[in-house]
Design a protein with these regions (language model features):
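Catalytic glycan-binding domains that act on GlcNAc-containing polysaccharides
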Residues: 27-153
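Bacterial N-terminal signal peptides that target proteins for export
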Residues: 3-13
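N-terminal signal peptide c-region/cleavage motif recognized by signal peptidases
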Residues: 22-25
């Protein structure tokens, strides 16, 4: 399983140029820099941006539970207390490049918990297993649509 994930990430990395073009409106260099800084896959970040906001840096969404998702990566307001310790406010979340860096940080936290797995990718959205698994499959579907992953067998 881990070897398959590593092979998939290598294939995804080789095809980076295609995704770079697909995610251009969200400052591609921010994705690359944030991913490098947090040691996460930039293509996964780009797919998350597409899933979350279709690369709209001004996106905001009020959830049924009263929380709010902010920016291109739809960072949830439940993270604001932790982010405030680093001087990050709600307004900061609406700055596209900073939003991507915060998303990379959040994804890294999930990878530290779950490893370099699809569970970690899904946990970016939710740690509830059914929601986590559904989300990771949505990210896989985006990568397949961008021809960055092989079709399901």
């Amino acid at each position: 399983m881990v070897l398959d994930m590593m092979k998939m990430f290598l294939r995804v990395f080789v095809a980076a140029f295609g995704a770079l073009l697909a995610a251009a409106p969200a400052h591609a260099d921010c994705f690359d820099e944030a991913a490098k800084y947090q040691k996460v896959n930039p293509l996964i970040l780009r797919a998350i941006a597409w899933q979350e906001s279709h690369n709209r840096p001004d996106a905001q969404h009020k959830n049924a539970n009263g929380s709010i998702d902010y920016g291109v990566m739809q960072i949830n307001s439940v993270h604001l207390p932790v982010l405030a310790q680093y001087g990050i406010s709600q307004g900061t979340l609406m700055e596209p490049c900073k939003n991507v860096y915060i998303a990379a940080w959040h994804l890294r936290r999930q990878m530290n918990k779950y490893g370099n797995t699809w569970q970690a990718v899904g946990a970016y959205h939710s740690e509830t297993p059914s929601l986590r698994d559904k989300y990771s499959q949505q990210i896989v579907a985006i990568l397949r649509k961008w021809n960055l992953m092989p079709a399901a067998r």
